[in-house]
Amino acid sequence: MTITKIHARSVYDSRGNPTVEVDIVTETGLHRAIVPSGASTGSHEACELRDGDKSKWGGKGVTKAVANVNDTIAPALIKEKLDVKDQSAVDAFLNKLDGTTNKTNLGANAILGVSMAIAKAAAAEKGVPLYAHISDLAGTKKPYVLPVPFQNVLNGGSHAGGRLAFQEFMIVPCEAPTFSEAMRQGAEVYQKLKALAKKTYGQSAGNVGDEGGVAPDIQTAEEALDLITKAIEEAGYTGKIKIAMDVASSEFYKADEKKYDLDFKNPDSDKSKWLTYEQLAEMYKSLAEKYPIVSIEDPFAEDDWEAWSYFFKTYDGQIVGDDLTVTNPEFIKKAIELKSCNALLLKVNQIGTITEAIQAAKDAFGAGWGVMVSHRSGETEDVTIADIVVGLRSGQIKTGAPARSERLAKLNQILRIEEELGDNAVYAGNNFRTAVNL
């Protein structure tokens, strides 16, 4: 079915920054996608094109990316008369039109908006939900797998004030029997945590960060983990709800000294207290012995490959590469060869097309890795990643706390998918790392 119209516009994300929205019109109607954007970004990500004009939106405008869709991509793609159901042909055409390896020319935000909208148009033409179309594109088997929601309930690092260096602490309801039950458990723990934070740290500690988590004035990881453990206990889920961390350690890595500064938000940080990667690895291991931690993301800096391989040999939990791999086939291949981690954080906007995102997941699955589909800190009401996580059978999604509509939009979409699929879907539960094989 041919495309009759492609139109992009600038809209706003959850942080009030401009982002790209793309409409594609075919005989089945209008198909719309909005692109997200990240706060702590890996240096090897596909290029998110921003205007750079400091007098407007602080330089974060996307009028160039929007113009690239309207003036360059739209006429070329319509003229090409490609079938919207042939996602790989469309994405290959977009990449060829851009002509660079990391989408610098047109912008990954321009290309991805089109790629996502194309997938929605194709699903409509086939008369199937988007997750079913993604499943066809990826060639995944049935039954469908509903993911474990990794809920970011407490923020530190560059997402929050306070001295806490680690960026995200997540609750993981992997013992729940169903996705909807996992959501209930997560929401109940979140409410307890919020009340506890206010009681312990004062009223303002209940305020939420970019991803819906609370950000009390916490100094150490232990303090954060104790608070979460207490909330889990008060909600009655001790032993049933696990914990995951996204350390985002590239943010506090001192490359010249090859050390990690856990007091990086303090300009007068004491250099003698900076840690080597071996010391940091020991810290993770002792935390994992004390608390029910099942997954650690970005435990080391994106260029500290030696540290990753060292940790991999000694830790048997899930080690997720995000800044390390940036959803990029070359870095994923390198991480597989060097045995750096055992799971991929899949952010569609890091690679810039649906086809390449699916391929990245397949590469990871092929190495026996887990795949966690992820939102970005600057999100929108677009729910494409909810359909992607179900279509890929990846079994784990990270899309914030059960708070803020742009986070809940994805989780609510998975609730609808769960209802629609009924017995044709299983909840990943404790098998979240190997869900693709269920």
UniProtKB/Swiss-Prot annotation:
It is found in: Cytoplasm. GO terms for biological process: glycolytic process. It is an enzyme of class 4 (lyase). Substrate binds at H159, E168, E297, D322, S374, H375, R376, S377, K398. The active site is at E211, K347. InterPro entries: Enolase (IPR000941), Enolase-like_C_sf (IPR036849), Enolase-like_N (IPR029017), Enolase_C (IPR020810), Enolase_CS (IPR020809), Enolase_N (IPR020811). Mg(2+) binds at D246, E297, D322. PROSITE patterns: ENOLASE. Its EC number is 4.2.1.11. Keywords: Allergen, Cytoplasm, Glycolysis, Lyase, Magnesium, Metal-binding. It catalyses: (2R)-2-phosphoglycerate = phosphoenolpyruvate + H2O. GO terms for cellular component: phosphopyruvate hydratase complex. The keyword Metal-binding applies. CDD domains: enolase (cd03313). Belongs to the enolase family. HAMAP family: Enolase (MF_00318). This is Enolase. It comes from Alternaria alternata. The lineage of its organism: Eukaryota, Fungi, Dikarya, Ascomycota, Pezizomycotina. The gene is ENO.
